[in-house]
Amino acid sequence: MTFSSPLLRFAPSPTGYLHIGNARVALLNALLAQKLGGDFMLRIDDTDTERSKEEYASAIREDLQWLGITWQREEQQSLRFQRYQAALEQLKASGRAYACYDTPEELDLMRKTALGAGRPPIYDRSALRLTTAERAAYEAEGRQPHWRFKLNDSAIDWTDMARGDVHFDAKNLSDPVLYRADGRPLYTITSVVDDGDFSVSHILRGEDHVSNTATQIQLFEALGFAVPEFAHLPLLVGADGKPLSKRWSSDSLKAMCADYEPEALGAFLVALGTSLAAEPVESLETLLESFDIAAYGKASPRFDVDALDALNGRQLQHGDHVRFFLRLAELGIPEEKAADFWAVISGNLGKFSEAKDWWRIINEAPDEIAMTAEDTEFCQAAAALITDAVATKEGYQDWMKQLKKTTGRKGKSLFMPIRHGLTGRSGGPELDRLIALMGVEAAQKRLGRN
């Protein structure tokens, strides 16, 4: 069997909100689908009916759309339980699925015994040696079987789009559980059945799934499906090379929406793991030209928050100003003042949410500012010399020259006390533009009170 056209998928479980690692996987799958000229499918893996919630599924959809990801098809696993059961019956009939009556305690003892003997902790297939009478005795005790897939004792090889040639010896792998004793299907079978039924041609996921892939390849074949191509990418780590902090590994993408621009976050996530520098982009489509799955290395990409903040700040300067103005209105900033305000402060933002702080600084004098007596006296002298002309670049430069001549100050000792006196901060927009925005009279009052 072959695939008529490329189809990729992202398959989140709606047992929680979308986090940064999964968002990256979704982005890369969506981009690869476009690069190959195929379609992208969202599959909601909600077979865990106790923990899955529509609230989470809806939030995942919203987060993907916020990132600019679109999909041409959506499927839901909870609507397909009969299909999974049919696949299990097919495997039973072919002798590739078998019933196991081992309890969790017995399996744990089996694992510890194998490790103690220096053997790999794989299932010993003792269930295959049970007699009919022994099975009947277990069921009389009330034991319900779980079902395993019997692997062929052969080599499992594939050429991974990201890792190159991959080899597993099936005799060193445990026969995977397909169905729990309570009758619930597990990811191993549901994912393969869906990928096979829907003709998913390429599967891109984290390297923690590599061993799953080895067993699933045999399952694809046992069910008569074509085997997709695979790409397994290293998992993200923190800037220090250690596992991501709880904030980034478990917090939802939605929590980041107020701080980061979707284009900046998308460009940053896509560039991670390659030698390419992340740059501000207009949309995800902009990334297609340079996107190449072969460009991703085998080392774990480092998620550097400072680098993301820097890129986000640049995105704010290059992004859609109309969209930013609408968001400024949501912060209570009048429409008629939005353009001038944005022109002055956008270059000093790392996150959009900081715009609200600058609006407050411009319109409300800081409560108390700790300054030396010398700087306080200097600011008062500056207030005495300020004129309406200071709101222009030329007038501001003349004011600085006059202050320099009058006080003997120069460099940082000249302009830093003024910035501090006006804003309470050591950094920010150019002072002439800032004064023009807050008004010369307000600037004079702030400097004169120090």
Tell what function each PLM region has.
Residues 225-368, 423-450:
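Catalytic adenosine-cofactor/nucleotide-binding cores of aminoacyl-tRNA synthetases and other
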